[in-house]
Amino acid sequence: MSFDIAKYPTLALVDSTQELRLLPKESLPKLCDELRRYLLDSVSRSSGHFASGLGTVELTVALHYVYNTPFDRLIWDVGHQAYPHKILTGRRDKIGTIRQKGGLHPFPWRGESEYDVLSVGHSSTSISAGIGVAIAAAKEDKQRRAVCVIGDGAITAGMAFEAMNHAGDIKPDLLVVLNDNEMSISENVGALNNHLAQLLSGKLYSTLREGGKKVFSGVPPIKELLKRTEEHIKGMVVPGTLFEELGFNYIGPVDGHDVLGLVSTLKNMRDLKGPQFLHIMTKKGRGYEPAEKDPITFHAVPKFDHTSGVLPKSSGGLPSYSKIFGDWLCETAAKDNKLMAITPAMREGSGMVEFSKKFPDRYFDVAIAEQHAVTFAAGLAIGDYKPVVAIYSTFLQRAYDQVIHDVAIQKLPVLFTIDRAGIVGADGQTHQGAFDLSFLRCIPDMVVMTPSDENECRQMLYTGYHYSDGPCAVRYPRGSGTGATLEPLASLPIGKGVVKRQGEKIAILNFGTLLPEAAAVADKLNATLVDMRFVKPLDTALILQLAGEHDALVTLEENAIMGGAGSGVNEVLMAHRRAVPVLNIGLPDYFIPQGTQEEIRADLGLDAAGIEAKIRDWLA
């Protein structure tokens, strides 16, 4: 879409933060209004993360107005809320390409702009990076400021508290802004807090506070009285005791939609020394009523007509793998009251909404705490319950030590249901599920299964749930099934594959949901086709049989080639001294950027035509 200057006259003046800082302060509310409308118009046409950005318009404008970005470092946590930041930092006219192949990255990305200090996508990393940036600036004596913006969800993660604990110890010059959009404040309390925030962030208060500490430091009773008086004054309206105890100077909560008030408070705070904490209250979806009423649904949106306020419904075709999992979970829980389901803040995405309503006493959303989720599951297993950890492939990476140390070493029967495995699509490098087979396959006593369709997925979930000799993992992709008939549930023989087609000379060993593409190629090449089903334990006998009956083997998986299922096949052949040529097809050795799943698979040669071409080129 082209930028309409007449529709956004103030925003038209701002294509960089230098231009933003030339505006008179009185024009900032109008700029915020235009920025919010432009964001609504753009994202509704292109798709993308939506409600979070609507809630951070005023904060974004105020931060770039007060701080000398990009010299001063502004770090966004996760990045869902950073679309206004992109618009104000030279990417206004490209915002309609966000999350698309060759377009703007869905999150702040270092390779895209000097304003994007830290590439993000996963949560709770900003404060740690901010401390490092602040310490580096102090070492170089550059008078550079560091600011981190973190949401009320991300700050619940342990990594954020680890960082704040460290900051309280080493006292870097750092501002942490908590964007709190989970609760509202009344006008009276809000006005009082806004006034108090400007008072407490002012130089006079800061000078008196530090001066008083020095003067009365040798008089313990008076020093204690001053401390208690300050705590009582702040405690009347401030919920910041925790952050004060961690060593931060806490200011807030303040109205995050009052851009002029934010500018005043941030100007006061900019030159304060040591770790500072600004708590702002915002409304997710601000300015667009449907998103304000239902911020979860409008968190990320497809293309839609924003004048109607209605998102397009799904075509109602084949069920997604997430729904297949959710249905199995409810079905199993109805028969077994030992089942306990755990998710780290991914209820909707993992297909657990219905389960959470039907079995609330057995549903545990542990928030953004993947490490805790896994060890919590270990404890449930020790207590003779049957935990199911529903987690995205990319987020399981964050709990790798817990999978090994707290579950696998102890052979605890925990079932990991790994959603978004393989190519995810529009969220790009940080969200592709490229590595789970590689990092799980090397763990002793771990069973790893790769279903080829929704029926096999159900059978594997059943198999893993009833397996008692250690942990199991079932990995499945984002997207819909194939329309396979759902058969009665039964346990599969552990570590056994199935020959789907008998051919000659070449055998294709498929791991996962690329089976339809593999079948099309096998028909063209008259190749044997095998649904391997298990990455660990591998069907060694079948691999050796195929090696003896064919001139060459081809392995196929939607996981990194390095260390993946194909590597396991290679290891079997080498261990048994079978000198048969093997072609490993999978994800290449680089981080895969955004695009649709179809676009990415075509680019990587993982559609039927690409797989056939790879095999023919290899055989030539």
Swiss-Prot record:
Subunit and interaction comment: Homodimer.
Pathway named in the protein's UniProt entry: Metabolic intermediate biosynthesis; 1-deoxy-D-xylulose 5-phosphate biosynthesis; 1-deoxy-D-xylulose 5-phosphate from D-glyceraldehyde 3-phosphate and pyruvate: step 1/1
GO cellular component: cytosol
Assigned protein family: Belongs to the transketolase family. DXPS subfamily.
Enzyme Commission (EC) number: 2.2.1.7
Annotated catalysed reactions: D-glyceraldehyde 3-phosphate + pyruvate + H(+) = 1-deoxy-D-xylulose 5-phosphate + CO2
Keywords: Isoprene biosynthesis, Magnesium, Metal-binding, Thiamine biosynthesis, Thiamine pyrophosphate, Transferase
Gene that this sequence comes from: dxs
Cofactor: Mg(2+); thiamine diphosphate
Cofactor note: Binds 1 Mg(2+) ion per subunit. Binds 1 thiamine pyrophosphate per subunit.
Entry protein name: 1-deoxy-D-xylulose-5-phosphate synthase
PROSITE patterns, alphabetized: TRANSKETOLASE_1, TRANSKETOLASE_2
Pfam families to which the protein is assigned, alphabetical: DXP_synthase_N, Transket_pyr, Transketolase_C
Binding site for Mg(2+): 152, 181
InterPro entries on file: Dxylulose-5-P_synthase, THDP-binding, Transketo_C/PFOR_II, Transketolase-like_Pyr-bd, Transketolase_BS, Transketolase_C, Transketolase_CS
Protein's organism: Klebsiella pneumoniae subsp. pneumoniae (strain ATCC 700721 / MGH 78578)
GO terms classed as biological process: 1-deoxy-D-xylulose 5-phosphate biosynthetic process; isopentenyl diphosphate biosynthetic process, methylerythritol 4-phosphate pathway; terpenoid biosynthetic process; thiamine biosynthetic process
SUPFAM superfamilies for the chain: Thiamin diphosphate-binding fold (THDP-binding) (SSF52518), TK C-terminal domain-like (SSF52922)
Highest taxon in the source lineage: Bacteria
NCBIfam families from the UniProt entry: dxs (TIGR00204), PRK05444.2-2 (NF003933)
Record-linked CDD domains: TPP_DXS, TPP_PYR_DXS_TK_like
